[in-house]
């Protein structure tokens, strides 16, 4: 719910409009890393397969050397950044970058929503909007934004229609729900830590 508006409302409140995702933020596909650049260590690169359950699985990421990651400097991500799969059977799925200390970049065909230097300040509204049924359906392979080949372009995504509330309502929503999104990210980071501890314990047990 945004202010007094609900999904059952037949009319938009004063100051609200039907806009597009592109009216809220820019979207671009990630960097096309060369196959020979992949390494076992280095900076993590987020691929489509790493977008899981509205989060990012950082432990399964491939890596590139720092000098190659630097070529994609426009696609370094921060905690709170939102990413979207742009091709394949999982087209349209989204994930929020969890809390982490690593330098991470985005691979080609993973879209990044550009929310500024402090993405968490704008992420709650976008995250909620992208999960809203009418919007998410347009981003799925059988929706109207993509093609028969299950592909989305940045323009496809930016053109998807959304309800755009008054600026003050958006700011209030983001402020109110920022801590909720932080909690989700912290929980995902904790799950990641516990998973690593589990792997260590299992390795020690099996080595006895």
Feature locations, PLM:
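A short glycine-rich beta-alpha junction/loop motif
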Residues: 104-111, 144-171
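Sequence-specific dsDNA recognition surfaces
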Residues: 19-37, 49-81
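Short, ligand-facing micro-motifs at secondary-structure edges
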Residues: 51-64, 82-85, 89-107, 124-128, ...
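Short, surface-exposed loop/turn microsegments at beta-strand edges and helix-strand junctions
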Residues: 35-45, 58-64, 74-77, 95-108, ...
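Non-catalytic DNA-recognition/assembly elements of restriction-modification systems
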Residues: 1-30, 159, 163-208
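Terminal anchoring/processing modules of extracellular glycoproteins
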Residues: 114-117, 127-132, 136
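Short, conserved charged micro-motifs
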Residues: 119-124, 167-171
